[in-house]
């Protein structure tokens, strides 16, 4: 069964009528063979547009269902990326997702799956310099859940990881991401790339000191055990005027009191 459904895209191309009549019903969650069928299918290729259109109602509810089983976590990540591609590349089409559908999918994910999805968005952005503006920013701005319960220390690390991958697009990506950031205790190691030269490019902090200062201030709580000393030092070196900024003064006060 798993081997058969791994070829579902090809079967849909070769004989769509037979595939819709004989195979698609097996994917309904109540079918006794649905578990091995989905397991095989999810180890295959991204569903084609005609197939995605047919099984879309099942895909929308798939993540909570597969998390009932003891499959490897990567399976949930595969589904989340398929759904992300349906929203990013086929928005509001029969084979794609609407804003509300994508938002509901994101809410249905476990925290670790949602954070892996953030990492995937970073990969999408890095594939082409225009992808940040054309695909990544719209999905985050239009679809990401606003509720406080989705802003965890793990999600902060994921968002910061996405930001330090955004290169020249850092200011515009940060502008949309910052609404999902809250002050939580996180290891200062997540900021190491903000002070390091990557591929002979100046560090993010040296290129965008104002946005970096705002980021550090936004995610730093009043009491913490790890402080981003190197980032603050580079901000002072790159843009001395910011040393009189209220955000900088607050962070320096935390440094001096620690």
Predicted regions and their residues:
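Non-catalytic all-alpha helical scaffold/repeat segments
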Residues: 1-258
């Amino acid at each position: 069964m798993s081997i058969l459904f791994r070829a579902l895209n090809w079967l849909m191309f070769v004989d769509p009528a037979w595939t819709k009549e004989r195979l698609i019903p097996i994917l309904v969650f109540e079918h006794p063979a649905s578990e091995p069928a989905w397991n095989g299918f999810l180890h295959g290729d991204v569903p084609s547009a005609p197939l995605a259109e047919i099984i879309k109602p099942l895909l929308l509810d798939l993540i909570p269902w597969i998390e009932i089983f003891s499959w490897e976590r990567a399976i949930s990540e595969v589904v989340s990326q398929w759904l992300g591609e349906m929203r990013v590349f086929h928005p509001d089409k029969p084979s794609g997702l609407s804003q509300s559908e994508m938002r509901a999918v994101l809410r249905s994910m476990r925290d670790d799956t949602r954070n892996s999805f953030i990492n995937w968005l970073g990969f999408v952005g890095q594939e082409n310099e225009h992808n940040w503006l054309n695909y990544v920013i719209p999905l985050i701005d239009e679809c990401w859940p606003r509720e406080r319960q989705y802003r965890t220390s793990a999600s902060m690390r994921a968002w910061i990881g996405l930001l330090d991958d955004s290169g020249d697009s850092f200011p515009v990506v940060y502008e949309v991401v910052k609404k999902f950031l809250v002050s939580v205790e996180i290891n200062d190691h997540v900021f190491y790339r903000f002070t390091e030269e990557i591929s002979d490019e100046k560090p993010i902090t040296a290129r965008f000191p104002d946005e970096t200062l705002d980021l550090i201030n936004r995610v730093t709580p009043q009491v913490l055990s790890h402080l981003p000393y190197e980032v603050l030092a580079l901000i002072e070196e790159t843009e001395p005027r910011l040393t009189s900024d209220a955000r900088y003064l607050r962070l320096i006060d935390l440094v001096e009191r620690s």
